[in-house]
Amino acid sequence: MNLVIDTNWALDLLLFDEPAAASVRAALQTGQARWLATQSMRSELARVLTYAALQKQLAARHCAAEQVLAAFDNLARLLPAAPRAPVLCSDADDQPFIDLALAHQATLLTKDRRVLATARRLAPLGARVAQRWNAVNEARGQTANKCCRPQQILKAAAPD
């Protein structure tokens, strides 16, 4: 299964100990799912990691932005930017996620209301939009696997 993961979801996956991200981590680590991304998505994550509030979160977790980006690099498969989708989002910053999901018939994980509002228009075109991985698993009759926590991902991504 192909996943496109927006920046807030990526933070839940790579930095925060968000329970909703546990089954996604497991699926990515076991190869059950593939995280599709573009260089601009990685750049957005890098930019967001410089925000003061996230710098405090990184410090509290004894983690550096570079570790989060290394974890992204280990888990995500970088692809060229996708062509513009016929379904447009009201926030242009979110459009690349929609474009990539549609181009690869992927599930887009997001909590963004504007992106979620595109779900009904994207579904007939072959892309899903979901707030939670469980919604995706339930639709496919799958169950969540156990997985490691974000700190284990970050340690695995840390350079020697």
Q: Residues of each region from the PLM?
A:
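Short, well-structured N-terminal submotif of metal-dependent ribonuclease cores
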Residues: M1-A37
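Short amphipathic alpha-helical segments and helix-helix/interface helices
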Residues: V24-R25, L69, F97-I98
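Short, flexible loop segments at the rims of nucleotide/cofactor-binding pockets, characterized by
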Residues: D12-L13, L58, P83-S90
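Residues that scaffold the ATP/ADP-binding catalytic core of kinase and kinase-like folds
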Residues: L13-L14, V48, Q57, T118-A119, ...
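Small, basic N-terminal interaction modules of short regulatory proteins
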Residues: N2-L3, P80, L154
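Acidic, PIN/NYN-like endoribonuclease modules and their adjacent C-terminal/linker elements
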Residues: L88-D91, Q95-I98, L102-L109, R113-D160
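Alpha-helix capping/helix-boundary segments
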Residues: A10, M41, R114-V115
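PIN-domain endoribonuclease scaffold, especially VapC-family toxins
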Residues: A27-R84
